[in-house]
């Protein structure tokens, strides 16, 4: 419902965590704007600051708490009247978080998203909403994937003007909070895997795909907003379609997304190695408009460690998968994350991981030290390693990864790349132009700086063909070969 105070209320959404959280924030922004709220960029200029928290790892939780506390300080110093925590940490800890974080005026879970406006309005009128009570969200949908589409929650939205529905397709309830040339599109939510270290399925729920028409409608809307690259995200993208009756639904979806007018690049995130199939490899390396980018979640390469993680694979199967990727597209971008110091991990396991990384030639590797996550199976495992051992192993693998990432970047010297321009800043009369090549995902995979010749003009959103001339870690320096395309 719209604000009832007679004057416009303002709200700022502060987002932490992954691209999936970015989508959630923009969907919340769309609902709040529909309800009459004014969206502002900075919390210190808003009546209400909504902090979309991340609960992935310990550092992310600390960052979320610090952000809530910083927003709460604004209540004493500025116009901000209320601070509300939402997102994964709020969903996961609920009332316990509320008790330990009284500075927040409310802790609201995912079920509050559909009527967030009413909750915020009530808070501004002095009411105290009941704090979210966590529950295992895997219990909210049928066990059988095929039965989930009929049971998935659908929030009723305000009617569209006559004539716009249903021919126009599903309504997009989203408001962009940034103006960059790329945007994430959530194609599914939840996860059915049972990795022992991961709490995400418990608070994100069972895996549910979004129907293709919803994904395409949102992609078309983003293209109308000037977006050139869409980043398809979920907790496990390779499972897309399992609840739609088609395990090859992702392969079928990709060409339709890439065909949306105005979209120049389609990127797919978070591929589960055990679920990657030949047809998907073909689609990701040969579909026009889809970049050959593989975000493969290896986590480790020692079969013994992977078994304790309840994951599949090992050094040789993973290397075979990488060979299949490069047989199809030698320049494909490949990134991964690994967990070091998992319970029961031996020095021999770390040696095997390091050997795998040396042979894998990955563009980017994120290295995480294991720490217990509340409520996970790994929390109960024996063989826990001392903190100093975990830290030493993280340091060892991180130093190796830094060398290997630089080596992989150096292999790209002389390579011709397509760079999506994301930033053009004038520095004393000379443009400083930064973007991403096809093998570089947003935010975490490095960037490419363009060394422009005199008179070469580019704008944000342009695709520039360039040749790689230098490297700095995962970052590249490249010189344009042809005029930019708009």
From Swiss-Prot:
Domain Radical SAM core intervals? 177-408
Query: Which stretches make up the MTTase N-terminal domain?
Result: 9-125
GO cellular component terms attached to this protein's record? cytosol
BP term (GO), one: tRNA modification
User: Entry's SMART domains?
Assistant: Elp3
- Residues binding [4Fe-4S] cluster 1, per UniProt: 18, 54, 88
Q: Which residues bind [4Fe-4S] cluster 2?
A: 191, 195, 198
A Pfam entry, by short name: TRAM_2
Q: Where in the cell is it found?
A: Cytoplasm
Superkingdom of this protein's organism? Bacteria
Per the UniProt entry, the Enzyme Commission number(s) are 2.8.4.4
Q: Which cofactor does it need?
A: [4Fe-4S] cluster
GO function terms (MF aspect): 4 iron, 4 sulfur cluster binding; aspartic acid methylthiotransferase activity; metal ion binding; protein methylthiotransferase activity
Which InterPro entries does the record cross-reference, listed alphabetically? Elp3/MiaA/NifB-like_rSAM (IPR006638), Methylthiotransferase (IPR005839), Methylthiotransferase_CS (IPR020612), Methylthiotransferase_N (IPR013848), Methylthiotransferase_N_sf (IPR038135), NA-bd_OB-fold (IPR012340), Ribosomal_uS12_MeSTrfase_RimO (IPR005840), rSAM (IPR007197)
Reaction(s) catalysed by this chain's protein: L-aspartate(89)-[ribosomal protein uS12]-hydrogen + (sulfur carrier)-SH + AH2 + 2 S-adenosyl-L-methionine = 3-methylsulfanyl-L-aspartate(89)-[ribosomal protein uS12]-hydrogen + (sulfur carrier)-H + 5'-deoxyadenosine + L-methionine + A + S-adenosyl-L-homocysteine + 2 H(+)
Q: Which residues form the TRAM domain?
A: 410-482
SUPFAM superfamilies assigned to the protein according to its UniProt record, in alphabetical order: Radical SAM enzymes (SSF102114)
Which stretches are transmembrane? none
Keywords of this entry: 4Fe-4S, Cytoplasm, Iron, Iron-sulfur, Metal-binding, S-adenosyl-L-methionine, Transferase
Q: What does this protein do?
A: Catalyzes the methylthiolation of an aspartic acid residue of ribosomal protein uS12.
Q: Which family would the database say this protein is a member of?
A: Belongs to the methylthiotransferase family. RimO subfamily.
Query: What is this protein called in UniProt?
Result: Ribosomal protein uS12 methylthiotransferase RimO
Which source organism?
Kineococcus radiotolerans (strain ATCC BAA-149 / DSM 14245 / SRS30216)
């Amino acid at each position: 419902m719209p604000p009832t105070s007679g004057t416009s209320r303002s709200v700022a959404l502060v987002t932490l965590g992954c691209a999936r959280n970015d989508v959630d924030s923009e969907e919340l922004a769309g609902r709040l704007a529909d309800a009459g709220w004014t969206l502002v960029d900075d919390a210190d200029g808003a009546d209400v600051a909504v902090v979309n928290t991340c609960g992935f790892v310990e550092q992310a939780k600390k960052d979320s708490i610090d952000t809530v506390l910083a927003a709460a300080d604004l209540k004493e110093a500025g116009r901000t009247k209320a601070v509300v925590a939402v997102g994964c940490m709020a969903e996961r800890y609920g009332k316990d978080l509320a008790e330990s974080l009284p500075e927040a005026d409310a802790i609201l879970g995912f079920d509050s998203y559909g009527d967030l406006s009413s909750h915020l309005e009530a808070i501004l009128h002095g009411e105290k909403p009941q704090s979210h009570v966590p529950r295992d969200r895997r219990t909210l949908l049928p066990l059988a994937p095929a039965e989930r589409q009929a049971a998935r929650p659908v929030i009723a939205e305000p009617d569209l003007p006559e004539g716009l529905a249903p021919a126009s397709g599903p309504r997009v309830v989203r408001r962009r909070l940034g103006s960059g040339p790329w945007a994430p599109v959530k194609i599914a939510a939840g996860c059915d895997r049972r990795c022992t270290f991961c709490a995400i399925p418990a608070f994100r729920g069972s895996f549910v795909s979004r129907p293709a028409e919803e994904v395409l409608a949102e992609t078309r809307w983003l293209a109308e907003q000037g977006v050139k690259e869409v980043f398809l995200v979920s907790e496990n993208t390779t499972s897309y379609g399992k609840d739609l009756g088609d395990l090859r639904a992702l392969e079928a979806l990709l060409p339709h997304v890439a065909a949306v007018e105005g979209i120049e690049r389609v990127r797919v995130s978070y591929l589960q190695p055990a679920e990657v199939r030949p047809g998907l490899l073909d689609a990701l390396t040969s579909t026009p408009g889809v970049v050959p980018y593989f975000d493969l979640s290896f986590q480790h390469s020692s079969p013994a460690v992977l078994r304790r993680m309840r994951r599949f694979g090992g050094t040789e199967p993973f290397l075979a998968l990488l060979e299949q990727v490069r047989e199809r597209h030698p320049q494909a971008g490949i990134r991964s994350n690994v967990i070091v110091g998992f319970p029961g991990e031996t020095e021999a396991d770390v040696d095997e991981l390091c050997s795998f990384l040396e042979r894998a030639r990955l563009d980017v590797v994120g290295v995480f030290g294991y720490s217990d996550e509340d409520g996970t199976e790994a929390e109960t495992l024996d063989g826990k390693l001392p903190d100093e051992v975990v830290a030493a192993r993280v340091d060892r693998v991180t130093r190796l990864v830094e060398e290997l990432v630089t080596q992989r970047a150096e292999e790209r010297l002389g390579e011709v790349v397509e760079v999506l321009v994301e930033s053009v800043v004038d520095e004393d009369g000379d443009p400083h132009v930064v973007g991403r090549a096809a093998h570089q995902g947003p935010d975490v995979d490095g960037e490419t700086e363009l060394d422009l010749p005199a008179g070469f003009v580019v704008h944000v959103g342009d695709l520039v063909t360039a040749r790689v001339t230098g490297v700095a870690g995962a970052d590249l320096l490249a010189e344009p070969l042809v005029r930019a395309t708009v």
